[in-house]
Amino acid sequence: MARNRDPFTQALASLRDRIHSGALAGGAPVIVQDEAQRLRLSTTPVREALARLSGEGLVERAASGGYVTVRFDATAARDRWAMHAHYVMIAVELNARALGPRRPPAPPFEPDRPIASANRLFSSLVCSAGNRVLWDAFLNVSGQLDLVRRYEAVLFDDLGDEARGLYAAYSRAIRPEFAEAVGRYHDRRMGAAGALAALVFGGAGPPDAGTGGEE
């Protein structure tokens, strides 16, 4: 771990990565003293980082005190995919209203990182809508979905084609083609929410399918 970052940022990045990677499984207690010792920090930045992650919906207060990681069940996954779709579609409408048939430039497509490429396309579109409340809400739910995204390649063998199709639809018309592609993208994930949540709960090691998060 690099030591050139402030303690809070270091603790936040490390804890978020451990949650997203599954090193801290859903429902697991996060022991402040242990995490501080692992990072060679005092407990203060670790507690501050956990408070931030609680606001992001990645940890929650335990009944006995301290924090536990959020357990992601099928309902939670389905609800968050539905909200993610809602935020992207709001951005589609805001951009169409402001720009007409024109579209903000799409980020580069990386064939070997289809999940990350799709995420960046959605993020770019929401960011370009120019609504800070929408952007913050999108980032929050997108960060929570990183818990299940890493397992998509276990269920779907066409992630590259799917992401390429999103980019192609976006290049042609934001409405209706891209909007329809966004709907299909989210519908299949909401339909697979139970299976994705089961993979998260089981802690299976996912294959590498370009699962890098927002950049």
Regions found by a protein language model. Name each.
Residues 1, 50, 106-110, 126-130, ...:
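A ubiquitous short alpha-helical element
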